[in-house]
Amino acid sequence: MSTTAMWLLLAVVVIVIVFASVLYKRTFTVHELALTGVMAALSLVAYLFFRVPFYGGSSFHLGNTFTALTALLLDGVSGGLAGAIGLALADILAGDPGYAVTTFILKFIIGITCGAVAHKVFKLRELDKHTPGYLAKVIVAAASGLLLNVFTDPFLGYFRNVYIFGQEYTIAKALTKITGGVTFVNSVASTV
């Protein structure tokens, strides 16, 4: 797939997510936009400057930490957008534009999941921070999206490698196993 087609695909994904936000009548305050932008920048910096590249296109990094943190502080959509924008741009700037589309989708899923568990299931905004179990609920909310990524990242990565990059099935399957392990370590490190 050409670079132009990848940019087009990324643009379509962004437009679909923005359109979905409009359908759900989601509006952002200036504070939310500013914090989302700062967290997107922090996730980009955490990926570009503090990562350990690993075989198969994956790497150890703490960029997902800011996705989960934004989802906990604001909401799932803001967290998803912070991680999606920051880490998709990081992929492009790191010279891996082919990964940007799946990164955008995966990080948005992390943010939505963390935010839904934090604010819809546990209702963290309504709880007193000093109540017993508050910290455990925060950790579970953060871990929910990050651990979901352990399954979705290798799954989407397999299809990206086979159908976009044109890899053989056996190679893509082997890389999926490696990616799953690296993603698990990233998830645990980002949760802690």
Report residues per predicted region.
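Loop-helix junctions at membrane interfaces
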Residues: M1-V192
